[in-house]
Amino acid sequence: MYRSGNLVKLKLLFWICFAGLNAFALSPAPYLPPLDIFNWWDKAQHAIGFGTLTVLAVLAYPQVSKYRVAVLLLLQGVAIEVLQYVGGYRYGDWQDAVADAVGVLLGLVLVKLIFKRLLY
């Protein structure tokens, strides 16, 4: 299925993206670029980020159920929103958690449609 070197690279890429997404999501708002464009772009960024994490996680950890990956990433998305809400310097938003869930679902669809040959 995979060469072990490729699997290590995928795992490393997943964890780099995971750390980057969390660092960006939990950064104080003054350090973020202003959101001058449409609000839908914020939701799209959530979906793209979590979709990317889903694809990388499923490819990097083929022994883990896709559904377990999905649940763990959904929990992570909710945890980020809770931390933003209680942190006092960001705003937790349930719509962001929904956008995260949409991204996870899109990631699973991408894996099934595009990466099917790698996994089955």
Which residue stretches match the model-derived regions?
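"…centered on the first transmembrane helix and the immediately adjacent amphipathic helix/loop
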Residues: 1-57
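Membrane-helix interface segments
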Residues: 8-9, 62-70, 93-94
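Small-polar-interrupted transmembrane alpha-helices in polytopic inner-membrane proteins
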Residues: 15-25, 69-85, 101
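Short helix-capping/hinge motifs at transmembrane helix termini and TM-loop junctions
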Residues: 26-28, 61-62, 88, 115
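Interfacial helix-loop-helix junctions of multi-pass membrane proteins
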Residues: 31-40, 80-102
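Short, conserved structural micro-motifs that define repeat-unit consensus positions
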Residues: 42-55, 73-84, 92
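Membrane-interfacial alpha-helical segments at the cytosolic side of multi-pass membrane proteins
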Residues: 49-63, 104-115
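Short, charged juxtamembrane terminal tails flanking transmembrane helices
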Residues: 116-120
